[in-house]
């Protein structure tokens, strides 16, 4: 059964796995602000701070209505030059490494909750002076390092990650509840360990999904872990909540959180990553060559790379949106007649990897050398994951504020040969 405010038919099914964004929304973005107008060499990422703040206001509304604590999952986005636009709205950050903890402390400056599948002694000694919550993946790790917690001069809330053995994520690479999952403790395992010193639980089972998925997940969490829910002080519902996407059921989310908090009298955390920066960033690239292919589709080579600069395109895989173009997604579309006034291209990357193809697209007019191409939704899992494979220059990082008359464009970082060389020796 669903709460009255949760629409089962409205649940979201992984937007980036080839589900197109509304084309009018893309055109609206393109007409409001020209993200390709920055006077620096391409490629570059450009983050719209006005869009960041709009997303933050949505998260802040959930916090106000539920008294929950929403964290930024730094694994998805760690571009700290815009943390000043995020920190006023959020409770803190969710970190998974020493580097993320240090960056969160230095640049975000609020609560830090840490989880990793395993810790070393040196890592914990480095982070314990800085963190507020520490989640262990196993009882082995907690028992090994609890002496460090006791020796700390700060109050550290310790929790266990649990595995409800339920996830609606279809892609196995993103499903944390498979039979071979390394994440969290199953109910029968938790039954056999001591909870002494543990005051919280954490689960993460979702990816780009709606509040109805959380509702169904919590039903299983309660069924399998209820005896522990009455003994703890806090719980983390993890990430994967697509709170800022159009049509997300915020009323449903708030009802779910409030009902759970009232029933168990717990502090509730959420740690979305993508939701914070959804539809806030773009990757601008330049056409270097247009190659005629008499037996297939003409190929456009850009000065960017799926493998190096937008790795989820290869990893998921998915086909990113391009402003003012249409993706060719279905296999049945590959050889379809061109629409009147439409030009079809394979968009390829600059590396020597044969499979470094971004996708197939239809454009309103033919592309030519020097044209700039704008990829949408490029804040999350790009700057924190990109590489200099094949010696490619990393895209620059630019911020703007589309709510101001001049756009307040700031070039935050450009990368040079020295950045490539110093990483290698």
Regions inferred by a protein language model and the residue ranges of each:
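Short, positively charged and aromatic/hydrophobic N-terminal segments
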Residues: 12-13, 23
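N-terminal basic/disordered segments at the start of proteins
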Residues: 18-22, 26
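N-terminal capping/small domains of soluble enzymes
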Residues: 29-109, 115-120, 363-376, 380-382
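Charged (often Lys/Glu-rich) extended helix/loop segments that serve as interaction or gating elements
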Residues: 256, 270-425
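Conserved, mostly hydrophobic/aromatic
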Residues: 52, 75, 104, 160, ...
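Glycine-rich beta-strand-to-loop/alpha-helix junction loops that act as flexible
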Residues: 205-206, 235-244, 272-274
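Active-site-proximal beta-alpha core segment in soluble small-molecule metabolic enzymes
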Residues: 68-234, 256
């Amino acid at each position: 059964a669903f709460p009255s405010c949760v629409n089962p038919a409205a649940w979201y099914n992984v937007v980036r796995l080839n589900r197109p964004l509304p084309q009018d929304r893309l055109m609206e973005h393109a007409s409001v602000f020209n993200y390709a107008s920055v006077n620096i060499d391409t490629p570059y990422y450009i983050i719209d701070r006005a869009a960041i703040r709009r997303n933050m206001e949505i998260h802040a509304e959930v916090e106000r209505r539920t008294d929950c604590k929403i964290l930024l999952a730094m694994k998805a986005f760690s571009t700290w030059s815009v943390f000043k636009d995020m920190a006023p709205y959020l409770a803190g950050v969710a970190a998974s490494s020493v580097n993320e903890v240090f960056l969160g402390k230095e640049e975000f400056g609020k609560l830090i909750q840490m989880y990793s599948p395993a810790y070393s002694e040196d890592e914990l000694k480095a982070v314990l002076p800085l963190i507020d919550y520490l989640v262990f993946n196993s009882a082995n790790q907690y028992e090994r390092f609890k002496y460090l917690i006791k020796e700390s001069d700060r109050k550290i809330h310790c929790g266990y990650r649990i595995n409800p053995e339920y996830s609606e994520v279809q892609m196995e690479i993103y499903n944390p509840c498979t039979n071979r999952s390394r994440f969290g403790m199953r109910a029968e395992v938790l039954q056999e360990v001591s909870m002494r010193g543990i005051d919280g639980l954490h689960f993460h089972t979702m990816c780009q999904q709606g509040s109805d998925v959380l509702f169904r997940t919590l039903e299983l969490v309660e069924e399998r872990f209820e005896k522990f829910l009455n003994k703890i002080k806090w719980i983390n519902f993890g990430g994967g909540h697509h709170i800022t996407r159009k049509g997300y059921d915020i009323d449903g989310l708030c009802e779910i959180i409030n009902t759970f908090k009232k029933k168990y009298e717990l502090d509730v955390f959420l740690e979305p990553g993508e939701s914070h920066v959804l539809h806030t960033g773009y990757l601008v690239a330049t056409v270097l060559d247009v190659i005629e292919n008499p037996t297939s589709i003409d190929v456009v080579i850009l000065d960017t790379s799926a493998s190096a600069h937008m790795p989820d395109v290869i990893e998921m895989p998915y086909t990113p949106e391009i402003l003012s173009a249409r993706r060719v997604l279905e296999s049945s579309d590959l050889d379809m007649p061109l629409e009147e006034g439409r030009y079809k291209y394979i968009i390829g990357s600059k590396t020597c990897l044969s499979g470094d193809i971004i996708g197939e697209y239809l454009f309103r007019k033919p592309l030519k050398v020097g044209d700039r191409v704008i990829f949408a939704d490029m804040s999350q899992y790009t700057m924190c994951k990109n590489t200099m494979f094949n010696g490619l220059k990393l895209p620059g990082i630019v911020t703007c504020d589309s709510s101001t008359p001049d756009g307040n464009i700031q070039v935050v970082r450009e990368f040079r040969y020295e950045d490539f060389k110093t990483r290698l020796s």
